[in-house]
Amino acid sequence: MKILQTQNLSKFFDGLKALNRVNIGVEKGSITLVIGPNGSGKTTFINTVSGFYRADEGKVFFEGKDITNKPPHEISRLGIVRTFQIPQPLKKMTVLENLLIAPEGYGERIFHSVSGRWLKEEEEIVEKAFRILEFLKLDHLWDSEAQNLSGGQLKLLEVARAMMKDAKLLIMDEPIAGVNPVLSHSMLERFVELKKMGVSFLIVEHRLDIVLKYTDHIYVMANGSVIAEGKEEDILNNPKVVEVYLGAQDSEIECGV
């Protein structure tokens, strides 16, 4: 069952077609990867799906419902959480505080409760936050200010905030960009555990040498269109994909193949 499906999704900028009838689907409880060279339309695609850009043609369906051109805050309430290449935490707040203000509808009340005045329902949220931090191996940093975290830890904090919102689908723009290989693998292993719990992922990523083995399905984009899709072995053995990545270069593909 597909939790997300686009149908002939197109987007224009100044008369130029940035997305050309794109059909991409994400199975529930899967990790779907979108790859392609710079300028292929990957980021435009996820921005259009998550409501930051308006689609000019086509449809976006989430859990079978048409969500085309809904604003980002409405899409977020449905269980779709978009994370960005550069994390956007509240830097002066601690890791725990960043999680406590994440759930929709609590906001300021939770923030003031950090000083120690907990209501029963707030205690449950704090317990949930600590469970998530432990799962992501961030629990030892709970009282650290976000501005003191490493790049990889900030990426995990974004995931933790999404989990606080009970995300059904995480749309992630280069989640392991700038993250060392050890932490990258650890992060992706956490994603695999989350997908076993029913969470779905739509990921745009360039570091294919690390991410490919964790994915269930891959779409390759070029010039705003999907040119190939399939499993890892299908993509790596597809001459069209090799041609797109190599271009005029007689060197290895970015993924090391």
From Swiss-Prot:
Domain ABC transporter: from-to ranges: 4-248
CDD domains: ABC_Mj1267_LivG_branched
Protein residues bound to ATP: G36, P37, N38, G39, S40, G41, K42, T43
GO BP: any one term: amino acid transport
GO CC terms, sorted: plasma membrane
Transferase in keyword set: no
Domain of life the protein comes from: Archaea
Pfam families for the chain: ABC_tran (PF00005), BCA_ABC_TP_C (PF12399)
UniProt keywords, alphabetically: Amino-acid transport, ATP-binding, Nucleotide-binding, Transport
One MF term in the entry's GO annotations: ATP binding
PROSITE patterns named in the record: ABC_TRANSPORTER_1, ABC_TRANSPORTER_2
Stored SMART domains: AAA
Family to which the UniProt record says this protein belongs: Belongs to the ABC transporter superfamily.
Protein name: Probable branched-chain amino acid transport ATP-binding protein LivG
Gene designation per UniProt: livG
